[in-house]
């Protein structure tokens, strides 16, 4: 039997098995199995991750207890958060109240770029800003190649568009507190079958439990992962020299730099700074680049 690990805690792995075609007429959704991992994984120094697709052996069908027998090949593996098989990241910030922290947003974008995960940006609380402000926010991130969406959990605007973007994917959802992330997740769960509520109860999902990464089945083939905080840039191997490669809009202009290994800060004849002066790169993004570069530089000293 094959399923997906949706939560791992204290040596137990909770594996969600989607409903079978035969069971569709009577079942209310998939089934959750509480599993332990076989000792062979420990010997091979392999740790199952949230997001893994696994084969399980059922030990007790009535109590839904089993063993993880095999981990199927991973499409990708994120270091922070430690999860696998992610198709996309959805990062949620408020349009206002609180105003978006662009430095924090750019940190997250860099982390995902470094780990090769496509990102969609969602600005919630659309009802609090003008169309002009929406355009301002778009102008910072759309030139960098990011999809920018606006939602309002108050009016319901944009929620269907988000559902469409998430469909058929496993998406990690992140965002600081106070931006309406939980409200959006609740809206996305409107269509979730009854069994998922039971699953949430079984794995003790609560309002303040995002200390652990956890996958929420939305419907068969569509999953979202509620992700803990992301302010740290502590990804092994991530150095200041890598930072510019995590700014997609810099990559286009880097070949025009006079010096190889240009940091795009102090060097003359820099293609990136030239693009900045021509308004092709956002000043907000560039200012954050300099701050993050300095932070990584200082970290390397120690």
Swiss-Prot record:
It is an enzyme of class 3 (hydrolase). Its main location: cytoplasm. PANTHER family: SMALL RIBOSOMAL SUBUNIT BIOGENESIS GTPASE RSGA, SMALL RIBOSOMAL SUBUNIT BIOGENESIS GTPASE RSGA 1, MITOCHONDRIAL-RELATED. NCBIfam families: ribosome small subunit-dependent GTPase A. This is Small ribosomal subunit biogenesis GTPase RsgA. One of several proteins that assist in the late maturation steps of the functional core of the 30S ribosomal subunit. Helps release RbfA from mature subunits. May play a role in the assembly of ribosomal proteins into the subunit. Circularly permuted GTPase that catalyzes slow GTP hydrolysis, GTPase activity is stimulated by the 30S ribosomal subunit. Residues 75-233 form the CP-type G domain. Monomer. Associates with 30S ribosomal subunit, binds 16S rRNA. One of its GO terms (cellular component) is cytoplasm. PROSITE patterns: ENGC_GTPASE (PS50936), G_CP (PS51721). One of its GO terms (biological process) is ribosomal small subunit biogenesis. Belongs to the TRAFAC class YlqF/YawG GTPase family. RsgA subfamily. It is found in: Cytoplasm. Its EC number is 3.6.1.-. Keywords: Cytoplasm, GTP-binding, Hydrolase, Metal-binding, Nucleotide-binding, Ribosome biogenesis, RNA-binding, rRNA-binding, Zinc. It comes from the Bacteria. One of its GO terms (molecular function) is rRNA binding. Its cofactor is Zn(2+). Binds 1 zinc ion per subunit. GTP binds at residues 124-127, 175-183.
